[in-house]
Amino acid sequence: MLCNMMQAQEIKKIKIVELEKTIKESSHPMIISFWATYCVPCLEEMPYFHEMIAKYKDKGLKLLLVSLDLQEAYPKQIISVAGKVKLTAPIVWLDETDADYFCPKIDSSWSGGLPSTLFINNKTGYRRFYEDEVSRENLEKEIKAMLNLQ
């Protein structure tokens, strides 16, 4: 699986078809954060994601960070920002330029705004999409719902 193959500072270039496959075949509950280096709210919510992944690690929770940066930022700027804000989760760069093509493949309601987050648990059929910054409280609430801990 994509998450197991990657180190935090290795940033693989992927197409939407590969991301769709990762989402469909995930055997773990997963948070997929769509972000960019220029998106301040994206960077502000990252510590919450890392905190929750550590907290619910024993439940198998995984995090995948999907950069939607422009091609000029790949990979150097993404690696630089990831290091500065201490991102430790796997990072991939979505090599797609047509948001009208790839956004509906993630969620039919997605206009392309950032940050955006997809919560999935294929074992239970759980799927929830947020097109906005996620607070620490809402993030934990969503994780508990995804993991059936409520």
Residue ranges and their predicted role:
Residues 28, 46-67, 83:
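Conserved helix-turn-beta segment immediately C-terminal to the redox Cys motif
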Residues 27-30, 35-38, 70, 113:
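Short pre-active-site segment immediately N-terminal to redox-active cysteine/selenocysteine motifs
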